[in-house]
């Protein structure tokens, strides 16, 4: 008759099995290919303000890959993720947040679809896989920085700028159609508020229409030839929102418009132009602004310029900036957001080679 195994032996066996299963699970997690990793990231919603779940996943995943990982609270329950090998002189960076609404993952033979596919869950995946390839090539002293809130004022980047580092170069990832961006336009958001005097619409002479005052100001702004830059092109203005009035039979006492300028010169110079046109006809409130950015070049790349803004203006302490990423900004923020699988796969090697090239350029 065979004796029963001691209880401690059984418990030890159970623990060994548990550890083995955890090891297998960790291995499966860390050996995800670029498309599997992108799918996993898209499946974790991270609309601006709710990035914690994807940050926790990234921290666990990067720790399992052998990175030293730091979580930095940019705001309550909104952690930035900084992962590094050694003391980085080159850092790959992009953002974890997306715009609303959430769009579920799907794919076909050519494309991956879903919220963040190109802006920027796919780019996160490409940067991580590039990091794996660098580790396999025994490259050290590089890092990955994934920040919250790029889509809503760059709060994560502004807080991450305080992380002590000695980085010489920052490779920022945004969808540039796999071209090296030579620069990106700045932005200036303004609210114009016109004041009038309410009256019965049958007696308009007794009132003053705030809407008509506002329309006059907007028409004058539309006729302005705003500054141009040889590289970035023209400053543009979008009248994004207009509201005002009480009812059709009331002379409107208040009206306002929200404008977004894509800027190729300094915000200060553009503000002087705006205020000169508006004069005293309306109040002007500036709610957001960042100057244009001119980025570094690397030989051998097709180049472009982009009209959108990035986290680069807020990451001034992370070295000289570069801007590159797979995917098209024209697909970002749309119901059919997507990224081409072949382009995403190529980006892994491009990011790796960029890190190697930049490290060699100054060593």
Language-model segments: residues:
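N-terminal helical capping/dimerization or prosegment-like subdomains
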Residues: 17-91, 99, 254-260, 272-276, ...
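Acidic/histidine-rich catalytic neighborhood of metal-dependent amide-processing enzymes
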Residues: 125-189, 229-230
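Metal-dependent amide/peptide-bond hydrolase catalytic core
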Residues: 46, 53, 73, 175, ...
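Active-site metal-coordination/substrate-binding segment of hydrolases
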Residues: 86-146
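Residue-level marker for buried hydrophobic side chains located in beta-strands
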Residues: 90-92, 171, 197
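Extreme N-terminal basic, low-complexity initiation segments
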Residues: 2-7
